[in-house]
Structure formats: C-alpha cells, structure tokens
Amino acid sequence: MIDQNKHQQLRIGLASPEQICAWSEKILPNGEIVGQVTKPHTLHYETNKPERDGSFCERIFGPIKSGVCSCGNSPGIGNEKIDAKFCTQCGVEFVDSRIRRYQMGYIKLACPVVHVWYLKRLPSYIANLLAKTRKELEGPVYCDLFLARPIANKPTLLRSRGTFDYEIQSWREIIPHYLSARPYYLFPRGSGTFKEREIATGGDAIGKQLMGLDLQMIIDRSHMEWKNLVELKWNRLEENQESTVDRWEDEKIRRRKDFLVGRMKLAKHFLRTNIEPKWMVLCLLPVLPPEPRPIVQLGEGGLITSSDLNELYRRVINRNNTLTNLLARSGSESFVIYQTKLIQEAVDALLDNGICRQPMRDSHNRPYKSFSDVIEGKEGRFRENLLGKRVDYSGRSVIVVGPFLSLYQCGLPSEIAIELFQAFLIRSLIGRHIAPNLRTAKSMIRDKGPIVWEVLQEVMQGHPILLNRAPTLHKLGIQAFQPILVEGRAIRLHPSVCGGFNADFDGDQMAVHVPLSLEARAEARLLMFSETNLLSPAIGDPISIPTQDMLLGLYISTVQNSQGIYGNRYHPYHSENKSFSCKKPSFYSYDDVLRAYRQKRIDLYSPLWLRWGEVDLRIITSVNQEAPIEVQYESLGTFHEIHEHYRIRKGRMGEILNIYIRTTVGRTRFNREMEEAIQGFACSEHPNKSLPALRI
C-alpha cells in the first residue's frame, strides 16, 4: 500500500468483507461483475485450460497469455467482431498476463467461519475479548455446543422458559427440554427454523458475540477491575506484614492483572486502527492469485504437479457448495450442522493445517502445506522471496580477521570489488578518456590491467559498502565500512566490530551491498559507519571492545623480563653468546628503539633503557617514597640512581640531568600507537589548537 506521503509500506491485519470484495471484484466492459469463485475445478482434463468460475478462471484472474483470451482471439487491427477491451464470447479481458500475480478472487461462504489464527494461536484474541478460555470457545466453533441467541432485545423461548441456566448448554440437553416444552408446529409462520430463531452455533455464534462487544466498555471495566486488584493486594500486604502472604492468592491476582492488561491493550488497538472484532469471523474467504499457487506440467505430456493450496481450496469450495444446496433444499438440521463443521475444518486446514487437531493429508499420508506454512519460516515467502531474495550490486563471502585494518575499514576481495563496482568503473574509465567506449572498457576490465586497479581504488574511495550478517536482529546487524582492496576471496574485518554482528571467525559469512544513490551513501557514511556505532542500542554498554585475541596479543607483546632491574647483574642469556650485551642498551628516542628492532639488534622482549622526555618524576612515581637500589658514580662527578623501573642521572649538585625508564620493544611500540591515536583524536576534536606532545 502507499500512504498519503507516498511511502510504500506493507501492513498485515484484518480485512473487512467490503475490503475483500474491493480486492477481488471487477466490472467487465459489458457491466458484468466477476470475482466470485464458485466451482472447485482448476484445469480442464482435455484442453488444460482454466475452467470457467474455477480457482484458475481467466475471467476472474486475467489471461494466461498477454492479450489473448480463452478462445485464442486477440484484438487485431481491422477485426471489428472483437472488442478492443475484452472478448464477448468468453468474457476475458485483453490485458497483461502479469495481472495473475496480484488479482484475487473470493469464496462466498454459506456459513460464517472463525479465523483459526485468532482462535487457536497464543494469545487467543477472540478468547481474550470474550473473557473465556479457548476450550470454551472451541465447542461452539466446531458445533459441539450451542449458544442461546438473543433477538432484538426480545427473550427467546428457551430463555423465557428457564431452560438455560448458563449461556452455554449442550445440544443434547437443549433438544429434550425444547421438544417437551413446545411443539415445533407452534412457531409463528415466517419465524424461521428452530436453529435460526433460538440457538446459534459455529462461526455464527462467535460472530454474534463479537458483534455485540462494546470496546470502550471493556476498557473501562477492565481498568476498574485492575485498580481493585491493586488495592486488594496492597491491603493484603498491610494486613500480613508479619505473617507469610499466601502465594497462591498472589499468583491468581498477578495472572488476572496480566489478563486485564492484555485485554485493555487489545481493545485499544482495535479502537485505534478502526478494526471491528467481528472481522475475525469470515463471511468471504479470499482466494490467492494463481501465480503463488501454480500448476506445473513436468516435460511434454508429463505429470502435472500442483500446489497444496489448490487442493485445500477445492475442498473448501466442495463443502461450501454442498452446504449451499442443503440450505436451498431445507435439508435436515443435523446434516446442516455437520456440513458447517466440515467447512470450518476445511478453512482451518487452508489457513493453518499444522494447528488443526487432525491435519489434512494427501494420498501419501503427508500433511498439506497450508497458507501459514507457505509464508512462515526461513523458507517462507517473506524471508526467502521478499526479504532474502538476491539483488544487484551485492555479494557474499566468508569473513576473516584483518589486523591491519582500522575500525571503519573492511578488506574487500579484488574479485568481488571489480564486479560490484563494474558500472562505476566503466563510467570512470570512459570519463577519464582511458577507454573510448563501453566495449573497450569491458575488455580492459576482463584483462585486469594495472590501470584498472588504480582507477578502482579511486572509485572505491567515494563509495562506502554495507555489510550484513543474518539474522539481522538489531540495527548493528548492518554497518557501513570503507572498502580496501585485499588479495584472496575472504572479506577481512576488524575484530572489534564483530560484537555488533554477533559474528566470529569460524566460517561465518556476510553479505556485501553497495548503496547507489547519493542519499544512501550519505546515510551510510554519517550514520552507519562502525566508528559511530560503538554503543549497544539496547542497554548503552560499549559493544566495540577489544576481543580476547587482541588482549592476549597485547599481553604477549608487552610482557617483560621477570628479573627486572637485576638483569643488569645477572643477564638471562649465556655469557658466551656475544650477540647480547651484558648490560641493557640505552636509547634516546622511540625511533632509535624501532630502528634497532628492525635491524634485529634487539628482539621484542629485550630489556632496555629509554630516555624519558619529561623531567617531572611525579608522572612516574614518588621519589621520596622509593630508595634507589644501586648508585653508580662517574669520573666527572655525575652519578646514576638505579631504581626498579627508572634510572636518574644527576649532576654534581644533585640536579636531575635526564631520566631513563626501563621498558621493552613491545611496550615501546604499544605506547607509540596509543600516543598517535590520542594525538589524532585530540587534533580532530580541536583542529585549530596546537596541542603539546602527549606522553603515556
């Protein structure tokens, strides 16, 4: 449907009989109204053409071939005998055959039928509104029990004679009382049969009760009862402050309150959406278009397979026609009641065969696939054909970790990237006069020359991509990333963003989508980038946090020698190994440490002294609280105070000349990365301010 703001949307709800007629009925050019399916036949056994007024009728659902009627005629030029709009012989309109995908029909039921979704599903909406249990309602629905029928504020004979003590009485109890109370022939002429005047059963009984509901009164009474229960509970708590409160009574009160709250919500929903409760009882049964329930012939002259829905529709039409004939011939009441029950069971099997007491089965003892089975589940119409169907500019691959990526980046395999961005790549090649036409551009892409990869990287800079991992349970199931070309066939992902996707690197797959319009790209870059979705939308906790692998890697890279400062005297390496010095090397800056590591003069865990740029020792520790472990004097009068984690060089007068801290290569690299990250964040927050160098 399209609302007043031209937003396309899909809404599932109850439809009125008038709405069902509007979906199904259409007026032919000759003024005839078609749309009602009255025959159970589908195709003729000799011609394989749809039967007239059947569940595949071309007059109701449209022609099988575009512009060709059931007779085989078409509105040719100069053919005056054939109307340009429809065929006068068979009544089929000359329209596109795609109309059979959405044109519906309807079955006019001979008796009202209760919709099984609203009766047997949990919660049962009909039982909730009528304030009864589901078992109490199943008796009247399936004609096992009968309800007394009020007629225009006039008491019925049964009620006036006191036959009914309760609203629901068994049929076996009603008949003896009634027959002994008054002869059947004493009914006034024109008052109808016993069943029509005095009692109701089946969907008619439930429909009459739903029709008489006052939703606003239900809300008011439920709210008043809920308030009384709350006051009762508080009074019981005040009286039983020192004694144990009866848990059974509390549980009964809690359940009753929950029932009242659910009933008020349901009644408010009906009022807000202008839906009548009586629409839960069907008088008109919609018939799906032929395309979702096809009949397919396997090969030339082979077997014909049909959807299970066609067989279920056939049973409904057969039983409905039987009841119509019984009512027309004034058949026996017992036969009418039994046929009403059969129609209710047939409609139940059509809508939801799995919820029935005894599901309808085929000749191979397999349950028929009902309408609910067609639309629900992973392989249903919604998830597989509407939400999960394949679309252009999308791909799919396995995810692996990408430790070299930033949080907002993802590694896109070159084979996938060149296919996803092929249209943009062709336009860029032609626009830069690298390729003269479309054919040459496609040929260059097939050859995959160096110039193609350069242009592709430039194209990808302006196009974020969307990654989606099924099932998409919240908004972080789809996030935007800046694609980076990588080798291989797997999508590379930063490990910190896996929390939002609920993904791990044990074979999980993700889908890739390319936003095309400018609005979609702007939304992806501003709202959907992973660096802007760091908190959980449900509870607000951080969701992009370091994983266990990252924490373990940081621990391994920053671990230090267990001997600490005493490694100066007792070096862990053997004295005969000349590649290691007996003393820790000293370095002036970070760059000197990393240069020595690249030249393999030291390894990742080698202990070393690194000059600290700040003279203020309060950053490191308190000088007054820690005594030096060792003091080394030099010939010029300067001396070194060796502490556990740092070394201070002082002059003759005791002034501090410089400070060296004890660290390792791994800790130096980690400190450098953290410093650059904090500096980058600070510069992005204050771009016009010159910030001092940060020390960690």
Swiss-Prot record:
Residues where Zn(2+) binds:
C69, C71, C87, C90
Which UniProt keywords are present, listed alphabetically? Answer: Chloroplast, DNA-directed RNA polymerase, Magnesium, Metal-binding, Nucleotidyltransferase, Plastid, Transcription, Transferase, Zinc
Q: GO cellular component terms?
A: chloroplast; DNA-directed RNA polymerase complex; mitochondrion
Oligomeric state and interaction partners are given as: In plastids the minimal PEP RNA polymerase catalytic core is composed of four subunits: alpha, beta, beta', and beta''. When a (nuclear-encoded) sigma factor is associated with the core the holoenzyme is formed, which can initiate transcription.
The protein in question is named DNA-directed RNA polymerase subunit beta'
- Name the cofactor(s): Mg(2+); Zn(2+)
HAMAP family given in the database record: RNApol_bact_RpoC1
* One of the record's GO molecular function terms: DNA binding
Q: How is the cofactor bound?
A: Binds 1 Mg(2+) ion per subunit. Binds 1 Zn(2+) ion per subunit.
Database matches in InterPro entries: DNA-dir_RpoC_beta_prime, RNA_pol_asu, RNA_pol_N, RNA_pol_Rpb1_1, RNA_pol_Rpb1_3_sf, RNA_pol_Rpb1_clamp_domain, RNApol_RpoC1
Cross-referenced Pfam families, in alphabetical order? RNA_pol_Rpb1_1, RNA_pol_Rpb1_2
According to its UniProt entry, the function of this protein is described as: DNA-dependent RNA polymerase catalyzes the transcription of DNA into RNA using the four ribonucleoside triphosphates as substrates.
Alphabetically, which GO biological process terms does the record hold?
Answer: DNA-templated transcription
Q: Where does Mg(2+) bind?
A: D504, D506, D508
- Which EC numbers characterise this protein's activity in its record? 2.7.7.6
Into which family does the record put it?
A: Belongs to the RNA polymerase beta' chain family. RpoC1 subfamily.
Q: Which reaction does it catalyse?
A: RNA(n) + a ribonucleoside 5'-triphosphate = RNA(n+1) + diphosphate
Task: Specify where it is mainly localized.
Answer: plastid
Compartments (UniProt record): Plastid, Chloroplast
What Gene3D superfamilies would the database entry show?
1.10.40.90, 2.40.40.20, RNA polymerase II, clamp domain (4.10.860.120), RNA polymerase Rpb1, domain 3 (1.10.274.100)
